[in-house]
Structures are given as structure tokens and as C-alpha cells.
Curated annotation (Swiss-Prot):
One of its GO terms (cellular component) is plasma membrane. Keywords: Cell membrane, Membrane, Protein transport, Translocation, Transmembrane, Transmembrane helix, Transport. Belongs to the SecY/SEC61-alpha family. SecY2 subfamily. The chain crosses the membrane at residues 14-34, 65-85, 104-124, 131-151, 156-176, 191-211, 247-267, 285-305, 343-363, 368-388. One of its GO terms (biological process) is protein targeting. It comes from the Bacteria. It is found in: Cell membrane. It is a multi-pass membrane protein. This is Accessory Sec system protein translocase subunit SecY2.
Amino acid sequence: MTKIYSSIAVKKGLFTSFLLFIYVLGSRIILPFVDLNTKDFLGGSTAYLAFSAALTGGNLRSLSIFSVGLSPWMSAMILWQMFSFSKRLGLTSTSIEIQDRRKMYLTLLIAVIQSLAVSLRLPVQSSYSAILVVLMNTILLIAGTFFLVWLSDLNASMGIGGSIVILLSSMVLNIPQDVLETFQTVHIPTGIIVLLALLTLVFSYLLALMYRARYLVPVNKIGLHNRFKRYSYLEIMLNPAGGMPYMYVMSFLSVPAYLFILLGFIFPNHSGLAALSKEFMVGKPLWVYVYISVLFLFSIIFAFVTMNGEEIADRMKKSGEYIYGIYPGADTSRFINRLVLRFSVIGGLFNVIMAGGPMLFVLFDEKLLRLAMIPGLFMMFGGMIFTIRDEVKALRLNETYRPLI
């Protein structure tokens, strides 16, 4: 028993469980002075925003202090990564502390937009001042977002899985209810349900295959002359971005939806804004095509976030490693980036076919939105499970060795 509790993996797992208890407890703290009987308070975007909030640690059904979730922080990370590719902006040339502070400022800006959009549309009880309730709930939602960011940082340093665990628990708690409500709303024949179940098994197999498949690049290390040198490889995933594109595209596309809600409240009689908001509503052709395009774009962007050729080449150069037939430095960087680009396109096409293709059915019936999101949900869920599994495996690696004395 003592050996079990002395394990690093067990200690980190217990700490993560404690943080999850805090998260579940906080998600049950309801915003004050709100009429909970009104469900469709965000108009035509309620179903999508509730689903996307559940994927990012939020919950728009219970209207708790964690309703917005980690969506502002995730959207800020996306924008920061996109801006970081520009050398002119010089975002990565500053210290880590300054970069983190700027990321938090960007998170605060997006959190204000999303929290204010939700608060302005909340069904406030008539016996209280609407202005004070909106102001208080906006502050509470912003505070809830930053509290979740803090929990994620704590879990990343002292627990297992980082922010992934919070997102995973939110999905487990909320997504099954979404799927059941869809089956109750939309009549689907039994034969179609059986076919969907079989396709789910096939998709799960393909997903595991894509996540575990690796392209091995032989690497030589200076001074290494033994029989193990042939086992030195640089591994590149067949789908380098994994399930991150789907997770972040849901968060990223929710920002315009919140922004349209906020602008619609500020300018209620603006015909052009109303027309644009209607065209970009969830399930409309413009939104579906933007969703598929952004999903493919994020598959490429996050592939380079996961495997940056410049960083890998610099690390190999410092450790005395090189790829056969490729000069160290800039040539190695270009070689790796070409491979990452090639596999990111393959991964992007896989993501678009599996997670973007079902979205085309939404053009015929918007009620199928939640069902169309299930394949992408599997991709996201699978990526999280594999990430946590690899982290636990790495933590337990040192415990497999026995002391010499």
C-alpha cells in the first residue's frame, strides 16, 4: 500500500481528482438572479454555443460561473500562435513573462466579449435591477474563466493532463445529454442507428491508426557507435495536429457568434449587421463552409505548433544529432518543415472528411447539428485519451527500474 501511494503517477492522479472535484463543484454554482426556466436565451445559436461551451469546459445549460469555460483562453492561444508566425510583430522575441502577460490580456478581452454577450441575454428576474445583474454576472463569468485557467496551470504542474482533463470531464458530463436530446427531437430509423454504430467502430479504428502511425526519419548521433544506432529515429505523426484542430475550431468560431450577439444588442436596428448575423448563423451554408475551411487551416497550423522544424533542428544541432544526407541547421529545418507540411495536409484532409463531411448534412436539417459533431468529438476525445495515456506511461517509466542496492 505504501508503495502505491509513493508512486508519482498516483500522487499526480489524486491531485487531478481533487481539482476535478473543485471544477464539478464550481459548475454547480448558479449565477445569481437568473430565471432558469428560459432555455433558448441566446436565440438560434443556443444549441451550438451550448455544445461548443461543453467542449471547452463550460456549461450554458446550468448557467454557472463556469458557463463560458476555457473558450476565451483557447481562442487567445489560437490568435497568439497565428500572430507568432509573423516575424515583423516580434511576439516571440520578448521574455516568457511578457508573452504570458500579453496572452492573458488577450484572454481578458475575449472573455469580456463572451461574458458580456451571455450576460446581456440572460433572463433576469424582474424584481432586480437589470444593469447591476448584468454587470455582476459578467464579472463572475470572467472570474470563472480565469479560475479555470489557474486550475489548468495547477494541474499542468502538479497533476496529469493539464487543461485536457477539465475539457474531458466537461465532455463526459454534458455531451451525452446533447446526443440524447437530439435523438428525442429527430426521428431516426433503427437501421440508420445500427449503421451509425458500425461506422463509429470503423471510425474509431481509423482514428487510432492515424494517431499511432509514425513516419520514422533515421537520425545519427555523433560519437554513437554501437548496435543501437539503427534505432535512433525522429518520429513524425501521420496526423501531426491530432484532435487539436477540432477542439480549437469550435472555440474559435464561437467568438464571432458571441460578437454578433453583443453587437445585435448594442445596434438592434442595424439591418446590415442583422443580415450578416443571420447568414453566419450556425447551420447556414456560410457557417458550414467557414467551419470546414478553418478546420483544414488549423490542421496545418497546429501541425507546425506540435513539430516546429526550426526548434527541432536547433535542438538536434546542440545535441550533436543529424539526419543522414542533410546538413545540420537551416537545411535540416527545411527538410523537417517539408515533411510536416506534407503530413499536415494528409491529416487536414482526414480531419475534413471525418469531422467536416458530416457537417454537410446540417445544410438539409439543422437539427442534425449535434449528431454531425460526433465524429469530431471522437477525434478530440481520442487525442485527449492518447495524450493522458502517454503522460502516465512516462511518469511510470522511472518506477520500472529496480535499485542496484
